[in-house]
Amino acid sequence: MGEKQDPDKAYGKPAKYDPSFRGPIRNRSCTDIICCVLFFVFILGYIAVGLVAWVYGDPQQVLYPRNSSGAYCGIGENKDKPYLLYFNIFSCVLTTNIIAVAQNGLDCPTPQVCVSSCPAVSWTVATNQLSQTVGQVFYAANRSFCLPGVPGDMPVHQSLSQELCPSFLLPSSPALGRCFPWPNSTVPEVPEISNTSISQGISGLLDSLNARDISVKIFEDFAQSWYWILAALGVALVLSLLFVLLLRLVAGPLVFVLIIGVLGVLAYGIYHCWNEYRLLRDKGASISQLGFTTNLSAYSSVQETWLAALILLAVLEGILLLMLIFLRQRIRIAIALLEEASRAVGQMMSTLFYPLVTFVLLLVCIAYWAMTALYLATSGQPQYVLWAPNVSLAGCEKVMMNTSCDPMNQPVNSTCPGLMCVFQGYLSTGLVQRSLFNLQIYGVLGLFWTINWVLALGQCVLAGAFASFYWAFHKPRDIPTFPLSSAFIRTLRYHTGSLAFGALILTLVQIARAILEYIDHKLRGAQNPVARCIMCCFKCCLWCLEKFIKFLNRNAYIMIAIYGKNFCVSAKNAFMLLMRNIVRVVVLDKVTDLLLFFGKLLVVGGVGVLSFFFFTGRIQGLGKDFESPQLNYYWLPIMTSIMGAYVIASGFFSVFGMCVDTLFLCFLEDLERNDGSLDRPYYMSKALLKILGKKNEVPSGDKKRKK
C-alpha cells in the first residue's frame, strides 16, 4: 500500500538557510518583462484614446445648454447670458419627458434663447400690444427675450407669428442652466396650458432636484463649517496615529477584552433566545400553527425560531471557547506580532503617510478616465438642420425641412414663418464615433487595471519597507536610512511588470463581475427563480474568487518585495508557506481583523459623536470662538466628518495591516530558515522567542561579560 503523504511535503519543502540572506535582496533583475511591455503598450494606447477623445470631444454640451442656433449659453458671445429660456416650455412638457428636456434642450419643438436672468414675474402680450413694435413691447420694457437679430421696428404680431419672440413669460428659477417655471405660478390665458400642466411637468423636476437652492445651501454650510470639518479630520488623524502607536502597550489586553466582549455578546444572545423560547413554549406557539408565510416577521412569534437561534449561538460560543483554550499559544503569537508591527510603524513613521501618495495616484487614474469618457461621449461634428415651429403654415411646403444648413447664415425674410437653422445633434458616422463603444470599453479596462496597479504598488512598497525592519538583526541600527523611498524606487525599477501581471488577473475577474451585475440588472424583471438562483451562484463564486486573488496577490507582493522573484514564483512560494502554517494564518487574520475593526469603530464613532454634539449646539461653555455655526443642514458637516474620518482611519490601518502581514510572512520564513544557533540566529523579537520557547545562542565571550 502507498505511504501516507506528509502534509508539509504536500505544500512544498521549508525554506532553506541562506547565509547571504539579510533581508530584501538588493542585487535583483527585472521580473515579468513581457507583462511590463504589455502594460506600457496598453498605457500608450490609453493615452492615445485620451488624445483622440480630446480632439473630437466637446464636453461643453454637457456643461452648457444650447439655444436654437446651437450657440452655448454662458460662454463666448453669450458669456453674460448663462440661462436658457424656452418660449413655450409646455410644448416640451406635453410632448416629452421633462428630464430628457433638461438633458437635451432642443428636443422641445419651441424656440430657445440665452438670457442673462430668468423672468421674475408673470407677463403675457396684451391685445392692444399686437400692433406695437418689438422695441416698444420688449426692448423698452427690458424684456430681452427675443431671438438675436430681431429688429426693434418689427410689429409684435409678426414676431409672434414667426415665433421670434415669446407670447408670455412665467416667473422661473434656473435649474440645470435652464429656466423652469415655479410650480405655483399664475398661468396666463394660453391655450392648452393650465396649473395642472405646470404641476405635472415642472413640480416633479424642481421638487426632486431643487438644484439651485440645495446647491447654494450646501455651499453656504461648507463655507460656514469647513474649518470645523478640518478640525474633526485632524482629531481623526491624531486618534488613528495614537491607536497604532499605542498598540505596542495595549495590544494584548485590548485583544483579550475584545474576545471576552464577543463571548459576552454571544452569551447575552443565548440568554435572550432562551427567554423568548421559554415564553413561547409555555404559550404553545408553534410553527405548525403558523404554517408557511412570506411575512418573515411572523416567524419571530414561534418557539422554533428562537430555538434555532439559541442552538446557533450556542455552537458559535462553544467554538470560540474551544479556540480560546486550544489556540491560546497562537493567539499570543498574533498579539506579539501586532505589538511588533506597532514598533515597526513607530520606527518608520513615513509609512503612515504613504496612503496620500496612493490617494493622489488613484485620483489621477479616476480623473483621467472620467474626462476621457466624457470627451468620448460628446465626440462628433455638430449637425444643423432647417426647422420651423409649424410646417403646415403657408409658405413652408416649399422648404426642405431637416436638411443641413449653416448656423452662421440664418434664414432671413423666409416665406415660412419661424424658419431657423437649429442644432440637431452630433454626427455618428466618423471613425471615432463608429468605434465609440470599443473605446469606452478600453477606457473601463484601463481604469480597473491602473487602479489595481496603483494599489499593488502601495502594497509592494510598504512590504519592502517593513521587511527591511524585520530582517535588521540589530534594531534600529541595521534598518536602512530611507527604507520607504528605497523600496519605492526598487519596486518601480524591477517589478512594474509583476505588479501589472497581478493587477491584470484581478482586473479580469472584476470586469467579469461587472458584466454579470449588468446582465443581472437588465434581466432582473424577466428571470424565473431557477435563473435567479444560477445567477446568484455565479455572482457568489466570482466574489469568492476575487477575495482569494486579492489575498494571494497581497502575499505575492510581499514575497516580490523580499526576494525579487517573478509574480508566479512569488505567489506559489507565498501560498505554500501560508498553507504550511494555515492555523496561524487563520488566527492572525481574525485577530487582526477584530482589532482593526475596533480601531475604525473607535476613530469613526468618536469623531461622529463629537461632531454631532458640536454641530447641533449641545456643547456649551466653550466661548465665542468655539460656538457651533448656524447651518441649513447640520447633518452635512457631520456626515462629511464621519466619511473623512473613515478614509483617514482606513489609510492608517491599511498600512498597519500590511505591516502585520509582512512581518508574519517574515516570521514564518525566520522559523524555517533559522534555528537560533550562532550561525543561524533568529531575527524575531525577544517577545516572540519567549512565547515560542526559543532563544538565540550567545557567543562565549558575551556570556563571560554577562557574568
From Swiss-Prot:
It is a multi-pass membrane protein. Glycans are attached at N67, N142, N184, N195, N295, N390, N402, N413. Residues 54-226, 271-306, 377-452, 520-557, 616-635 are extracellular. InterPro entries: Choline_transptr-like (IPR007603). Disulfide bonds: none annotated. One of its GO terms (molecular function) is choline transmembrane transporter activity. It comes from the Eukaryota. Residues 1-32, 248-249, 328-355, 474-498, 579-594, 657-707 are cytoplasmic. Keywords: Antiport, Cell membrane, Glycoprotein, Membrane, Transmembrane, Transmembrane helix, Transport. GO terms for biological process: acetylcholine biosynthetic process; acetylcholine secretion; choline transport; neuromast hair cell development; otolith formation; positive regulation of cell growth; thiamine pyrophosphate transmembrane transport. It catalyses: choline(out) + n H(+)(in) = choline(in) + n H(+)(out); thiamine diphosphate(out) = thiamine diphosphate(in). One of its GO terms (cellular component) is apical plasma membrane. The chain crosses the membrane at residues 33-53, 227-247, 250-270, 307-327, 356-376, 453-473, 499-519, 558-578, 595-615, 636-656. It is found in: Membrane; Apical cell membrane. The keyword Iron-sulfur does not apply. Choline transporter that plays a role in the choline-acetylcholine system and is required to the efferent innervation of hair cells in the olivocochlear bundle for the maintenance of physiological function of outer hair cells and the protection of hair cells from acoustic injury. Also described as a thiamine pyrophosphate transporter in colon, may mediate the absorption of microbiota-generated thiamine pyrophosphate and contribute to host thiamine (vitamin B1) homeostasis. Belongs to the CTL (choline transporter-like) family. This is Choline transporter-like protein 4.
